[in-house]
Amino acid sequence: MIIFPAIDIKDNKCVRLTQGEFDKVNVYYDNPLEVAYKWKNEGAEYIHIVDLNGARSEFGVNTKIIEDIANNIDIPIQVGGGVRDKEKVKSLINAGVTRVILGSIAIENLNLVEELVNEYKEKIVVSIDAKDGKVAVRGWEVVSNVDSLTLCKQLEKIGVQTIVYTDISKDGMLQGPNFDIYERIAKETSLNVIASGGVTSIEDVKRLKAMNLYGAIIGKALYDKKIDFKEAQQLCLLGE
């Protein structure tokens, strides 16, 4: 299982939000590139980046810093946040981003997702943000009536290989992940599942690894030193 340290970027700073609320911002570092180097130097295999301004349709604010990370860090990065059209996908991939994460358009335009998957294959990842089993869109501001497991199956059908699944009610709350939903997705699909939201302790990491998930994104717990990155990384490399 891959541990993805999360770098959430808002106004060119590394921050964390609580439950996706933009008025609950905690700034951890002024320079996200510095943070990317930190995780790389600690042995990260992959870095997960979210453009929070992009998620709220404030485009271009963090473009340069994301390009700087892609060009300076020689490990793969995946980037999401407000990616809703072909041009944005193309510009991120041209900027050196390894995988692009699509969010709201998976609900709003499944045909476009299929087109992008046909063109970019495994470089396209879909992020499913859910609350009480229903998919949330537009930077978590709107909860739809689409069932998250049903969406997972539809995505698998059109060729998506990897998803990031976030339980919004758990994100940034340090309460532990929603293990049940990960188990169901793993059981009912063959998608590579990256768990996100609420990974709080080394016990959570052990449990997710035991479920044979593809990866886990950890943000707040790393920055608040609830989880030691190297310990989590070692744990995930055991038995592989």
Swiss-Prot record:
One function term, GO molecular function aspect: 1-(5-phosphoribosyl)-5-[(5-phosphoribosylamino)methylideneamino]imidazole-4-carboxamide isomerase activity
Biological process per Gene Ontology, one example term: L-histidine biosynthetic process
Catalyzed reaction equations: 1-(5-phospho-beta-D-ribosyl)-5-[(5-phospho-beta-D-ribosylamino)methylideneamino]imidazole-4-carboxamide = 5-[(5-phospho-1-deoxy-D-ribulos-1-ylimino)methylamino]-1-(5-phospho-beta-D-ribosyl)imidazole-4-carboxamide
Source organism, top-level taxon: Bacteria
Subcellular location: Cytoplasm
Pathway: Amino-acid biosynthesis; L-histidine biosynthesis; L-histidine from 5-phospho-alpha-D-ribose 1-diphosphate: step 4/9
Entry's EC annotation: 5.3.1.16
Active site (UniProt): D8 (proton acceptor), D129 (proton donor)
Primary localisation category: cytoplasm
InterPro entries: Aldolase_TIM (IPR013785), His_biosynth (IPR006062), HisA_bact_arch (IPR006063), Isoase_HisA-like (IPR044524), Isoase_HisA-like_bact (IPR023016), RibuloseP-bd_barrel (IPR011060)
GO CC, alphabetical: cytoplasm
Record flagged with keyword rRNA-binding: no
Keywords, sorted A to Z: Amino-acid biosynthesis, Cytoplasm, Histidine biosynthesis, Isomerase
Family in the record: Belongs to the HisA/HisF family.
Listed HAMAP family: HisA
Protein name, per record: 1-(5-phosphoribosyl)-5-[(5-phosphoribosylamino)methylideneamino] imidazole-4-carboxamide isomerase
This protein's encoding gene: hisA
